[in-house]
Design a protein with these regions (language model features):
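N-terminal signal peptide c-region/cleavage motif recognized by signal peptidases
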Residues: 23-24, 28
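N-terminal export leaders
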Residues: 6-11
């Protein structure tokens, strides 16, 4: 190889290294979006978030690396709010009603048999009611990207006898959801203890509580059938998992990246809405196949439960915030 050829090869190598360095620099500038959540891998919301990550990757041509940390690996459920708001992590999926102590209005969908129709579920995201709540979340350092339905139903599980009518709850130590929802349980004579879904199985197993409450699908995913004999399902509440991000982090992203993430969040939101307001026959079947005796309340039985629970919960909600009645009026318009 002559000197001229050597110089040409060297020039090409230098040019190639320059391109590689530029590509490496560009890659190092890519966005990392870490999401913390409490759900086990089999949980439907965990699977929805995995699809969200895939959608973001596809939409951004791999420029955004969505890293998901489920099963409370990084933060406990009650730590996610602070972690996102202070920038310790970019994002989290939080069960909305768990923020009810900080933002009382987040409990509105826990009013028994109130926001559980399929029509209201479809209309809620993007509604004036949702916008009011989004504004309150932003005031607390959380930018909400989506309202993912966690459960549009609920199942009371028990070991000794099925909890079918209000009188069956008298004296029962039961998993509560929030101070607000628990007013309805207290009205029926139960003794609720609020706790995250991740803690319920052990509480049932050790006898800390007698009865559980969760979504029908979650009862299967969290293996309640191993520690409970009976399950009574109904369209009692609407629970959302909100996908929240740190506002400063999100607003600092390029516009196209923000749009891709928001679009993927909207898809996750839409995927989460059930096809029917009926209790999933598949979810009931799954529990029955594991040996649990499961029944679904009739409309008349739901009415009896609503009459026993709703007045106390509604009264507590109206007293919880100056904006409570405004929110109720907005939900009534859905």
């Amino acid at each position: 190889m002559n000197p001229m050829t050597n110089r040409r090869v060297a020039a090409r190598l230098i040019a190639g290294c320059t391109v590689l360095a530029a590509a490496t620099a560009a890659w190092s500038a890519d966005v990392t979006m870490r999401i913390s959540h409490q759900f086990p891998p089999a949980h439907h919301s965990a699977k929805n978030l995995e699809q969200f990550a895939a959608d973001v990757k596809a939409a951004t041509n791999g420029k955004v690396d969505v890293q998901i940390f489920g099963s409370a690996q990084l933060f406990k459920p009650n730590q996610n709010h602070s972690a996102v708001a202070t920038g310790k992590i970019e994002a989290a999926a939080i069960v909305g009603f768990t923020l009810g102590g900080t933002i009382p209005e987040m409990n509105v969908t826990l009013i028994p048999y109130y926001v559980t129709s399929l029509d209201k579920m479809k209309k809620f995201p993007g509604s004036e009611a949702a916008k009011l709540l989004d504004a309150k979340l932003l005031d607390k350092g959380l930018l909400n990207l989506g309202w993912m339905v966690d459960a549009s139903d609920g199942i009371f599980t028990s070991a000794k006898t099925a909890l079918v009518k209000p009188a069956d709850f008298k004296g029962v130590k039961i998993r509560g959801l929030s101070k607000l929802f628990d007013e309805g349980l207290i009205a029926m004579g139960a003794s609720p203890s609020a706790m995250p879904g991740s803690e319920v199985y052990q509480a049932l197993q050790t006898g800390v509580i007698d009865a559980g409450f969760t979504g029908v699908a979650a009862a299967y995913e969290r293996k309640f059938y191993e520690v409970q004999k009976f399950g009574v399902a109904s369209n009692i509440i609407l629970a959302h998992d909100i996908l929240v991000v740190n506002p400063a982090w999100f607003n600092g992203l390029p516009a196209d990246i923000r749009q891709a993430i928001q679009t993927a969040a909207h898809k996750a939101e839409q995927r989460s809405i059930p096809k029917s307001a009926d209790i999933s026959a598949e979810d009931v079947k799954n529990l029955r196949e594991k040996g649990m005796t499961v029944s679904v309340l009739t409309p008349a039985q739901e009415k009896a439960m609503a009459e026993a629970m709703q007045p106390a919960v509604l009264k507590a909600f109206q007293a919880s915030s100056p904006d409570a009645q405004k929110l109720i009026d907005l939900v009534n318009k859905l």
